[in-house]
Each structure stands twice: as C-alpha cells, then as structure tokens.
Amino acid sequence: MDQSDIRSAFFVECEDLMEALNEGLDRIEDTLDDGHDDETVNAVFRAVHSIKGGAGAFKLDALVRFAHQFETTLDALRAGRVSADPPLLALLHKAADRLSDLLQAARTGSETATIDPDDLVAQLAQAAGEEEAGEADAEDLGFVPMRLDLDLPAAAPDEGQSGCYSIDFSPTRALYACGNDTSILFRVLSDLGRMEVRLDRSRLPDFDALDWQESWLDWHLTLETDEPEHQIDEVFEFVEDLCRLEIRPMAMEAPRTDPDPEPDPEPDPPASGPAAAKKSPAEDHRTSSPRATVRVELDRVDRLINIVGELVINQAMLSQCVQDEGVPPRSPVRNRLDDFRNLAREIQESVMAIRAQAIKPLFQRMSRIAREASEISQKQIRLVTEGESTEVDKTVIERLADPLTHMIRNAVDHGIEPADRRLHLGKPPVGLITLTAAHRSGRVLIEIKDDGAGINRPRVLEIAQGKGLVAQDAQLTEEEIDGLLFMPGFSTASVVSDLSGRGVGMDVVKSAIESLGGRITIASDPGVGTTFTISLPLTLAVLDGMVVDVGGQTMVVPVSAIVETLRPRPADIHVLGSGDQVVAIRGSLVPIVDCGSIFGFRAPVRSYEESVLLLVETARQKLCALVVDTIHDQRQVVIKGLENGYGRIPGVAAATILGDGRIALIIAPEEAVDIGTSGGTFSMEF
C-alpha cells in the first residue's frame, strides 16, 4: 500500500468519524435539558482527535490547526469548565461543518484559502475560556517524532507514595488506525510516577506470515505512583475499547531498573488480594471490537452486480429453452432449474444489499443545510429525522442530495413563518421540519414535512397566470394548482436571495426524482403545513416488471407503477369534445393513452374491447390508463441503460434482455402519460 492509498483510506475513515461527530452533537443537543452524557462528549472528542491525528500525518496544517482548537473546546466541555447550552451547541455544529469543508478541500486537493477557519477558531477559543489561538500555539500542533526514555522516572516520587500497579496493555490494529500513539500514552503514565516498561514480542509471527496491518506487540508496565487509580484509568479513557487492558494493584514494591531480556510468563492470579483485576470492555478484542468490515471500490461492486445480472438473464434464457423443448413441468430438469432460479435471485439480492446504504449520512447533511438556511433567513428551525437506518441504493442516495437540499431550503424560506408571526398564530416560535424515510411496498418513501404556513394556492395561481403558464380564466383544482409548482421557471419568491428566487426550483427537483424512477406528491393544509412525499425504487439495477405486447413489440411496464389491470367494456369508453378518450372506472373518468400509438408502432386503436388497460398512478395526471395489446407475464428484469448508446428516448426508461434473447424496452409511465395526454407521438425504428 503506497502513500496515496493510505491517504485515501484516511479520508474514507474520516467519513465515519464525521458521521459519529455529527451524531454525537445531535444527541447532546437532544438531551440538553437533561444534561449531556459524558460518554457522548467523549465520543465526539475522540472523533475530532482522530481526524487531527491523521491530518497531522499528512501535513494538512490548516486542518490540524482547526481540529486542535475544536478539540480544545470539546475538552473544556467534557472537563466541566464550560457548560453545554444552545449557543455552544450552535457553535460546535458550525465547527463540525467547517471541519467537513476542510476535509473535503484536502481530499479533492482544492485550495483551502477560500475556507477561512480563523473566525471560528477565535470563537471556539473564546467559548473554551482561552485567549485567541496565535502563533505561539504552533509548537503544540507539531508532529515531530521524539525519543522517549521511559525507563527514567519523570520525577522523584513523593514521600507519601503509596500505590503500585501492574498494567498489561495490548493495542489492536484499530487503535493505530484511529491515529493513536502508544508512546504518548506511556509518556503521560510516566508523569504519574516511576514506571518500568517491558515489551512482549512473543506473538510476532515469522516474516512470511506477518500481516503488517495487524498489531502483534504487548506491553507490560509497572507503575509506582501516589496518584489515585482513576488517574491511571483516565490515561486509557479514549483507547480502552481499542485495546486489551488489565490494571492490577500490587503490593508496594519498587520497580526494577533493569528489565529482563525476555518477558516473564504471566503470573497466576492470587487466590486473594486487595482488589479484583480491572479489565477494559475490550479485554477480548476479537469479540468486543466492531464488526469487521472490508472497504471495496464501488466500481468493483458494480462489476459484480453486472455479472450477477447476466447470470439472471442466462437463467431466464435457460428456462425459455427448457420450455421450448417441451420438458415436463415436474421433471428433474425443471426442479433443478427452479433451484437455479431461486439461487440466482438470492445471489442477486445479496449482491444488491452490498450497494445498500443507510440514509443516515444524507439526513445528517440535511441537518447542516437546515442550520445554514435558518441562519440566512433569521428563522428558528428544528429539523427532526426519522428512519435514518432505512437502506437505499448508494446511487439513489447520491442523486437525492441536490433535490433534498432544495426542498429543505424551500421549507425554511417559503414554509416556516418568522418567530413573531408564529407566536401571533399561536404556534411555537421554533418551526419544525420532519424528514422521514421508510420502506413500503418494495419502495422507499421519503417525506419532507413542515408545520409552516402551507401553500397559498390563490397566490400560486395568480403568479402562474401572470407568467402566462395558465389561462387567465382557468379554473383549477387544488391538486392542479399544487402541480404548478413543478413547472419550469415557476417561483413564488419576489426577491432573489441565497435561498430562492432564481426560477430554478421544483421542476428540477421533479426531474431529478423521476430520473431515479420515482414520483413526488404534495399535500398542503393552509396554516398547518406542507408535506412532500418522494417515492423511489429500492435499487436502480433490477425491477419487477410486467411484460406486455404493444403493436407487435414486447415492452416492460414497472409493476410499482401499476395500480390495476382491466379489460374495458365498450360502454365504459367515452369520447370528450376534444376528441380525447377516457374510461369510466367506479364513477371517475380516467384518461386513456395508447402506447402503440405514442411510440409509433401502429395507428391509434379505435376499439379497446380486445386490449388491456394498465391503470398507472402519476404525479401530474393521477390515474391514467395505458393501452397494451396483451400481457405475457410478470418477472424480475435487469435494467440496462440506453443513454450511452442511444441517448435519451422519450417515454422509455431503459431496456432489458428477455429469456429468449430479445431486447425489450422498459416504459417510463410518467413520461408516456405526459406524451399521450399532450397529444404527442414518438416514432422508433426497429
């Protein structure tokens, strides 16, 4: 592993550390009224300390200097020199955001000059009760190797010295990975009194079997001190979960000055003694350490997913061959083929789970967005997240960041009222935004809910009419007015600000979500609040599809979009004055879109008696009926993108390979409905 690989591993590790940092700050904030938990503060301190240690190894001076002051303020908090209150928590959140910016700049190699941490450094120093950090602090930040002569006592013991301790210390690889240095621990211990250090290398294997990433050395320490035992505990406070540690009080005995060349065998524990041995939670580091994980490049996972996808296609082709050969249903070949199909699907689901990632990091990023928007708008905001453990395809999470950012800013800017206005309305001064994620019916639902003013529909309609988006005499339903928010260039902001008013808004959000195979809907109650609901597929690699025939072509419709299938009666079909056809379903008139016609496969169908209608739900038209000729079956298909070879095809989401080797296009129901209801067609040559 070369330097660049180690550097990359450090920044990947920083992602987890930043997640722990933000999670800890949120937990402290949530328990502010009950008093913060010391262990939570310690966890936050450890995260910043580990980032600082790694940054120092790579000479990231700006990052080290900022992390040092951040760490100092956290140390003052855990030591009780400062108390946790809302202003301090707001400052710590800002510091975490700035630390994230510095990490990102260092990771990408971009200039850090545009990120000025000095203002926050001064604020952190002031919060810690210190003078502003200056040039004199530079020596504190240096990472210059030094030789420690630990066999020499740090100071002569006092006359009243009365304690002697045996310490067995075995660091794990995780201890070093977090940027800790055993020599620093030993130096702090030596400050407590006279100490003897013996190195045990008996676990060190032969060179051929040596794993350089593993920790093979054990240390046996003897400490004579007049300090209480808890002072020794505090030295190991931040590494006790990363090592095997045992501290035993001993009978008073001066430590030897000449260590043995080889370590003595560990003595049997006495039958009785003044105190029982004290062991750390990580005494057995193999069982108490976090679950072992392996970091794998995303490209490798994608290649594996593609191979498994080909395996599924191969299994479908084999099934088709067996069917064409007329093999009896309950024959041994069929049974083995069923086993193959089940195994292939299980492998596929397991591989897809590798790409699955908890949505928590994205929600934590939204907390930062909400804080920034709150500061810019001068509104009091509280963001609550639920369902952070919900797992979604990593690609979906990455592409959701921009839409969610815009929606959170919109909720702050347009939804939540100023504090004085909220008090006048009988609401609490702090506006509430709730961000929720959950699995439902094979999809992921994300809700962005605020308790603000709701959508001012008369104002929205007035703006749309003023921009010429709808006719002046148009009579629209509430749902149709809400849909105007998704039209390109629409904005209710009268002044351009850092948050909104530039005319690039919800239409971009809608397009981004639809590109993921998702839908977005609105529910708003004036004076109560607004809820945006995003429905997304679990993965972008496979989908459950209904295989249909359209004008002699085989196509696939996502099952997640289908509400109902039916064969209409002639009496249920009606023609409107505009010439458009609708079907009457349980008292409602549902628009009809002929897939064969809009894709140019054939002329429009005049009678739908022999056709099948697929009722699909869309954001714009709600229910709409897609006309197909026949339904073949329902199956899981592997998604193959078309953009690289053919570009964007209206009404088509992607393609797949069927069991007989044919290529079938996957219909994008939302786009197909838009094309059909607007009177458009799109011709495709085969």
UniProtKB/Swiss-Prot annotation:
InterPro entries: Bact_Chemotaxis_CheA, CheA-like_dim, CheA-like_homodim_sf, CheW-like_dom_sf, CheW-lke_dom, HATPase_C_sf, His_kinase_dom, HisK_dim/P_sf
SUPFAM superfamilies named in the record: ATPase domain of HSP90 chaperone/DNA topoisomerase II/histidine kinase (SSF55874), CheW-like (SSF50341), Histidine-containing phosphotransfer domain, HPT domain (SSF47226), Homodimeric domain of signal transducing histidine kinase (SSF47384)
SMART domains: CheW, H-kinase_dim, HATPase_c, HPT
Keywords: ATP-binding, Chemotaxis, Cytoplasm, Kinase, Nucleotide-binding, Phosphoprotein, Transferase, Two-component regulatory system
Modified residues (Phosphohistidine): 49
GO terms classed as biological process: chemotaxis
EC number of the protein: 2.7.13.3
One GO location term (cellular component): cytoplasm
Histidine kinase domain boundaries: 290-540
Task of the protein: Involved in the transmission of sensory signals from the chemoreceptors to the flagellar motors. CheA is autophosphorylated; it can transfer its phosphate group to either CheB or CheY.
Subcellular location: Cytoplasm
Cysteines joined through disulfide linkages: none
UniProt-recorded name of the protein: Chemotaxis protein CheA
Residues covered by the CheW-like domain: 542-678
Boundaries of every HPt domain copy: 1-106
Gene Ontology molecular functions: ATP binding; phosphorelay sensor kinase activity
Organism of this sequence: Cereibacter sphaeroides
Catalysis performed (reactions): ATP + protein L-histidine = ADP + protein N-phospho-L-histidine
